[in-house]
Amino acid sequence: MDFVLNTIQWLREVPRNFKGEVATVVFDDSADILVYCCVLYILLVFMVPEHIMKNREPFNLRLPFVVWNIGLCLFSICGAYSCVKNMTALYWERGFYRTTCFFDSSVAYDGEFAFWVFYFILSKIPEMIDTVFLVFQKKPVIFLHWYHHLTVAIFCWHAGHALIPSGLWFATMNYCVHSIMYFYYFMCACGMRKVIRPIAPFITMMQLLQMVAGTLIVLYTAYHSYLSESGCEVDRTSIRLGLVMYGSYFFLFAVLFGKLYLKKQVKPSGTASAYAMSKKRNGEKMA
C-alpha cells in the first residue's frame, strides 16, 4: 500500500517540478527529429503497404492495439484534467483576451500546466503509431487520417518553439476529445464495437466542434495581431499555419461526417455489398 501511495505522490510531484528549459532545448535545438519522424511516417503510409505488406498476411495486433489505446486514453484523461483545471483558473484570472494573446511564463512555462502541454506536443509523434497498426493489419489509411497526424505534429512542434499562448486552448480541447476518442477505440479493440457504436457520431461531432473552436481562436488572434491596436503576441507564422490547418480539418471532418451519418443508406447488392462489408470490418470509420 505504501508503494502505491508513494507512486501516486511521485506522479503528482513530477509535473509540479517540471522546468520549461527542457521544452526550450527540445523544440529549439532538436527540430531535425521532427523532420526524421515525418519522413519515416510518409514512407510508412506510401511505401510499406505496397512494398512490404502487399503479399503478406495481416498481423494480429489486437492485444497491442488494446494496450495502446487504453494507454493513450489514460494519458489524455490525465492531461485533460490538469489542463481544464489550470485553463479555467487562468481564464477567470486573466480573461479570454490576455489568456489567448499573451504568454504567462509564470503559469505556462514551468510546473504542472507546462508539463502537460509539453507532453501533449511530444505525444503527436508517438500518436503516429496509430497508423502503424492500420498498415500492418492491412487496413485502409484514408487521406484524413495521415494528413491529420502529419500536419498536427508539425503545427504543434512549431507552437512549442514559438510559445504561442493560444496553444494552451488547443491542448486543452484536444486532450478532452482524445480522452473519449481513444476510449472508443479501446472498446472497439476489445470486441465491443456494437455496444460503443452509438457514440461514434458524437465523437465525430466533437472533433468538428474542436475544429470550429480552433478556427475561431486563430481568427481571434489574427484580428488582434493584424488589425487591432491592442495587439497579440501569437507568432504570425503560427496564425497562418493554424488557419490552414484548422480550416482544412473542418472541411475534411465535415465531409467524413456527412459521408458516415447524413447520407441515406442505400442497400448495395452483390460485389458492392461485399466491398462495403469489407470496409466496415476493416474499421474505415474515423481518422
Curated annotation (Swiss-Prot):
GO molecular function, one term: fatty acid elongase activity
GO biological process terms held by the UniProt record: fatty acid elongation, monounsaturated fatty acid; fatty acid elongation, polyunsaturated fatty acid; fatty acid elongation, saturated fatty acid; sphingolipid biosynthetic process; very long-chain fatty acid biosynthetic process
InterPro entries according to UniProt: ELO_CS (IPR030457), ELO_fam (IPR002076)
Root EC class: transferase
Major localization listed first in the record, in broad terms: membrane
EC number of this enzyme: 2.3.1.199
Protein name, entry field: Very long chain fatty acid elongase 4
Organism: Trypanosoma cruzi (strain CL Brener)
Protein's gene: ELO4A
